[in-house]
């Protein structure tokens, strides 16, 4: 029997881009990377677990902030080289900047304009964890 993880086209570093979307609204919340272990754990634990390239280890989304992403559905694109996680974003904040989405800037007239508010000060989110913003 073929392993479902073998169907994924991992990049040269053994990673695949993972896009998290709100399962109700479809809004793109963030993009991160997953290795084979992260994706397998995400599927088995029904929560988003990524691979932190800067830390070189698994990153359980929400382990420091409390902003866990509960998995509702996992999708693979037609080229098998990108996954989408349809998630429930606990606390409504996906971005380390304290915003709902990491995609909070819009290109307008030759510049990037911030269009989404900070819902919670990042220092208040990470004050107890000594977090390095990823």
Curated annotation (Swiss-Prot):
Mg(2+) binds at residues 77, 79, 81. Its EC number is 3.5.4.19. Its cofactor is Mg(2+); Zn(2+). It catalyses: 1-(5-phospho-beta-D-ribosyl)-5'-AMP + H2O = 1-(5-phospho-beta-D-ribosyl)-5-[(5-phospho-beta-D-ribosylamino)methylideneamino]imidazole-4-carboxamide. Zn(2+) binds at residues 78, 95, 102. Its main location: cytoplasm. It is an enzyme of class 3 (hydrolase). InterPro entries: PRA-CH (IPR026660), PRib_AMP_CycHydrolase_dom (IPR002496), PRib_AMP_CycHydrolase_sf (IPR038019). GO terms for molecular function: magnesium ion binding; phosphoribosyl-AMP cyclohydrolase activity; zinc ion binding. Pfam families: PRA-CH. Binds 1 Mg(2+) ion per subunit. Pathway: Amino-acid biosynthesis; L-histidine biosynthesis; L-histidine from 5-phospho-alpha-D-ribose 1-diphosphate: step 3/9. Keywords: Amino-acid biosynthesis, Cytoplasm, Histidine biosynthesis, Hydrolase, Magnesium, Metal-binding, Zinc. It is found in: Cytoplasm. GO terms for biological process: L-histidine biosynthetic process. The keyword Zinc applies. GO terms for cellular component: cytoplasm. PANTHER family: HISTIDINE BIOSYNTHESIS BIFUNCTIONAL PROTEIN (PTHR42945), HISTIDINE BIOSYNTHESIS BIFUNCTIONAL PROTEIN HIS7 (PTHR42945:SF1). Belongs to the PRA-CH family. Catalyzes the hydrolysis of the adenine ring of phosphoribosyl-AMP. Homodimer. NCBIfam families: PRK00051.1. This is Phosphoribosyl-AMP cyclohydrolase. It comes from Pseudomonas paraeruginosa (strain DSM 24068 / PA7). The gene is hisI.
């Amino acid at each position: 029997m073929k392993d479902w993880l073998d169907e994924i086209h991992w990049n040269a570093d053994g990673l695949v881009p993972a896009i998290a979307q709100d399962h109700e609204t479809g809004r793109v919340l963030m993009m991160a990377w997953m290795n084979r272990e992260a994706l397998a754990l995400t599927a088995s634990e029904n929560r988003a677990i990524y691979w932190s390239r800067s830390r070189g280890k698994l990153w359980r989304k929400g382990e420091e902030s409390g902003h866990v992403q509960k998995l509702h559905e996992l999708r693979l694109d037609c080229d098998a080289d990108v996954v989408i996680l349809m998630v429930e974003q606990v606390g409504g904040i996906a971005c380390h900047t304290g915003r709902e989405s990491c995609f909070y800037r819009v290109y307008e007239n030759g510049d990037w304009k911030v269009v989404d508010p900070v819902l919670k000060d990042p220092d208040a989110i990470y004050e107890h964890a000594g977090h390095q913003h990823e």
